[in-house]
Amino acid sequence: MCTIDHASRRLWLNQTIDDNVAQQICAALLAMTAADKDKPIRVYINSPGGTITSAYMIINMMMSAEVTPPVWTTGLGMCYSAATLLLAAGEPGNRVVLEDTTLMIHKLKRPG
């Protein structure tokens, strides 16, 4: 699973994105919003990607009316496939790709 630090409002995604990871991240976003409706939430991404529908579950939650704080995204190491979309969904002006991070995007395919 990903690492979540509620006190510092930071999430580290260091694995493939699937439904379980998406559910964990969405729950953390809601919990952090309940704790403080304004303070930014930081998401650090080092992921080979994963299931596109799971990534959109996270993205939709980030952009929903239920998550009011800005969500800042940072790419560390690699952001491939669906993880690149997650990185791009961060708050405009607060999407960062560190110097040695690699990005990769390809034609998207839905499962099934």
Spans of model-derived segments:
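Terminal-region recognition feature
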Residues: 1-112
